[in-house]
Structure formats: structure tokens, C-alpha cells
Amino acid sequence: MPGNTPSPDFRLGDIVLFYVCDTDADRVSTRQVFKATIASMTADRVVLRLRDNQSYAEALPIASCYAVEHDYVDSSFLLQYKGLYAMLDASPHRRGLLVGEAGESPVRNMSRRLSYEYDSPDLSRILLKALQAEDYFLLVGPPGTGKTSVALRNMVREFLAIPDYQILLVAFTNRAVDEICDKLETIGEVDDYIRVGQTLSCDVAYRSHLLSERMKQCRNREEASRSIHSCRVFVATLSSLSGKMELFNLKRFDVAIVDEASQILEPQLVGLLSAKTPTGRDAIGKFILIGDHKQLPAVVVQSAEESVITDERLRSAGFVDCRISLFERLYRRLPEGSPFADMLDCQWRMHPDIASFANTYFYKGALRDGNAPHQISLLPFTNMGDDKWERVIATKRTAFFPTKTLCAGKKYNNEEACKTAAIVNALYRLYERNGLEFDERSVGIIAPYRHQIARIRQELDKFGISAFDTIRVDTVERFQGSQNDCIIYSFCVNDESQLEWLPSYTEESGQLIDRKLNVALTRARRQLFVLGNSRLLSRNPIYRILITHLENISSE
């Protein structure tokens, strides 16, 4: 690949292995291997933290070169097997709910009432359903509807209003857990919370809440037990919690709220939901799953053919595909209008011109705009130069920029990378001309391949502008849950095989939905720019409609 900028294949907190690599003969199979975690990373330096103490300094000679490779912990597979076994050993009612046994249905307590008043009747309805559900409640959170900032946050407030109610908050990624912690900091009713997890995977702002830090303050087991029992709110990633199931020997939770639930496969989650206390009670009284099956699902290596379930007894219970999350399976089994499910329908993120495509083609027009200031105001670029890029960026909410050059068989496209960098540079100049602050929130760039990500980085580096170092350039999978004022999406489709690989389809009521495209388009708040080869992209019916849609809006 042209250029020598390294591909951004490693991230903070990744587990890695490394070894001396001074000659071509040095490989992982011929050298002593050390395991570590990435503690920090810049353009010219990577800091690794060894996972085990190393007292023999000569084993790591300073003058040597080192190779760093990805590592993985196979305990996650073991935890899934344990989770499936735990489900088989769960209480009869909980197991019946999870596997869809006949005669086992969720129930609700109609006597419960909300403790607070809300301006939105829709939010009040959703919170009341969540409060009254005795077994489980499912909440669909489309892009920008505030599933964490509004729904989860107010659920926590309502549950804390119940005396001695114990709350467990779970998400799939550390980034989502950081966001939950951020929202907890804004809830006056939350006087304390404990986070289960690793130091390097936790944002610095929340490390004082880590369970490991709390235990350091305890002088004996009695103090440790009191600290755990007295705290009503616990937060964790699913993987961290699955590795600390002994917590349920010390504490029972009345409710578990699982964010990003549509990204979690059943074997990963059922173990947690099936956990029992030492006395045999369900360790989690009820569970609330928050997700959106129309956004990115769990990452699965197996093909559709390998994942299909053929056993008729399982299919009759809703088990049709191993790639489907528990959230989606339960949601599809509930009747429309069920008291055990609902959907947030007011989006506060995207300008209406940006939201219109996903709303029309993926959500059947069910979303409405919240009329946030940035959704109803004009673009702030009153001063602009004569440069063609500046004039387009200053006046257009959305645009499709066609590219002609194809890099056949490659996972990068030079023309798209150059145009992407030109758009960013024009946007930066517009910020300067209009006295606006340009930072990491201003623009985000999505591309499907790390080689294309590296090419875009190379083009940005050519401008020599330090502010560009903070711009996030990543895959759509890494962008889920994020937002930027402007999103640039480089399709980087060079041949038909890539066109077939790119989408992530699901179907609902006969409507084909591309979950990757849905996430990519809905990360943008103020502006959205898409680049790609229109001739190739138009062979996909959804992409063809998107191009026409963007061109129509751009011409208005």
C-alpha cells in the first residue's frame, strides 16, 4: 500500500503479545512471548503494561526491535458455555421466560406508579411500563433518541425512588459503560456507584469508582462486604461482570438494565440473567434490555448458512438463527402494543435532512424530530472563501461526491481518501473564517477498511494541521453509539465482491434494512457527506435510493 503511515489496528486497552524481532527469522513461534495491555498510544510511541511481573530485565533488551500482535482471551468462550449451563440450571420461571416455554409469560405489577413527573407523555408511558414489568421489559432505541441520556437515566431515578432497590447497569462495550457513568454523575439521587472492570479500560474520570479501588480502602472482609452491600448502583461491561459472578454470592439486584443488548448474543447474556444467589433465588429480579435490532448486531464469524437453526422445536420457540440476540428474539415474539416492549420515537441528534433517509426507509416514518437548536438553525458558515470545496460545505447539509477511480481488488481508494481530506480541510477553514472552535466533535470519518483509514490519515497529515490529529477515522462498528457534527462516509467499494460484503441486512415486515448503513448515516448531527463510485453502488438497490435521496436534498 502506498505511504508508510501505520494502519490503526490497535487501540487503547487492547490485549496484545510482543516479542523481540531483530531479524527476519524472529517470529512468535521462535521467540519468548510476553503478554501485555496497551496503556497509551501516540503516532510515534506505544506504551505496554505487562500482564505479569518481569524481574529479569535482560529478557527485554532496550536496543532490540519488537513485534506487537493482537492477543485474545479464550475465557470468553468458556464463559458462554458456562452461561448456557447456568440457563439450564436457572429457576423454572426464569428459564421458561428465556427459552420461550409454553405457559411461561411475563407479568406486571399495576400498582406501581411513577415518582416523578415528565414533560413527555411518551417518556412517562415507557418509564411506567419499565417500572411495572415484573420479569422483563424491552426498549427499542433508534439513533439519537436518548436511550442512555434520557431513558436509562430516568429509569435509574425511578428505581432509586423505591427504598433499598438495588440496580445493576450493564453494557457491551467500555465506551458505553463510560457513557453510563457520565449520566450517573448528573443524577442527584445517585450518591455513589461502583464500577466492575479494569483500570485501563475505564475512563480516568471514573476510575475512583472501580471495585478494585474501593477494595483498597477496606481494611478487612467485613468492611469490603459493607461497602458492596451499601452501594445501590453497580456498573459493568458484560465481560467484566461475567468474570466476577461471585458478586452474586454477596449481593442480589432487583433490576438489571442492559444497554446495547441487540449487540449481545444469547450465550453471552443468558448466564448473567440466570444467575442465582446462594439461597437459590434469582440473583437479578427482573431485566430491562435496551437496544435496536435495526442497528449493528453482534459480530459473528459464522456465515448465515452455518448459523441457521433447523430444529423445529427450537424454531417454534423463536430460535431461528444463532446470530440473533436475545433482545431481538424476545422482541419479535411479543405482540404489537405489548406492555413489555416500547420504542423511543423522538430523535434529538440529526438535522431533519439527515434523518429523513433512515426514518423513511428503515423506521417507516416512525421517528419525529425533537427540534433541538441545531436541528432547526441554519449552518453557521456565513463567511466563506472562493474554494469550491468551501462553498459546497458551507451551504449543503448533505451531499454525495461521486468518484471515478477504482483500485481493483484493493481495500483502499486513493480518490476517495484525497476528497475526504479536502472536505475536512475546507471544513476546518470555514471554522476559522467564522470564529468557531474546531475539535474532535466537529467531524468524524467512517470507512470500511483499515487500509482506507490509513490512506485518509496520510492525506490529512499532508496538511500539517495539528487539529487533524484528534479527528476520529474508524470503521462503522467503532462508531456505533457515537456522534459528530459532520460525518464523512467513504464507501471504498472498488468491485462487486466488496459491494456484496459491505451491507449487514435484516428484514422486518418485508422491509430490507441495511444495519451498517443505518449506523453510518445516523452518526451526523449537522452535516453528512458520502463518497463512492455511483456506477458500482447503484447496483445495490438501497445504495441507489440513497444516492438519489442525497442528490435531491442537495439540489434543493
Please give the residue ranges for each predicted region.
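Pre-ATPase regulatory/linker segments immediately N-terminal to the P-loop/RecA-like helicase/translocase core
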Residues: 4-128, 132, 182-185, 190, ...
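Pre-Walker A (Motif I) flank of P-loop NTPase domains
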Residues: 122, 133-139, 164-165, 232
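Walker A/P-loop
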Residues: 133-157
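Walker A/P-loop NTP-binding motif
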Residues: 148-162, 179, 183-185, 274-275
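Conserved helicase motor core of SF1/SF2 NTP-dependent helicases
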Residues: 161-165, 173-174, 239-241, 247, ...
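Conserved helicase NTPase catalytic core signature
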Residues: 169-172, 177, 181-182, 188-254, ...
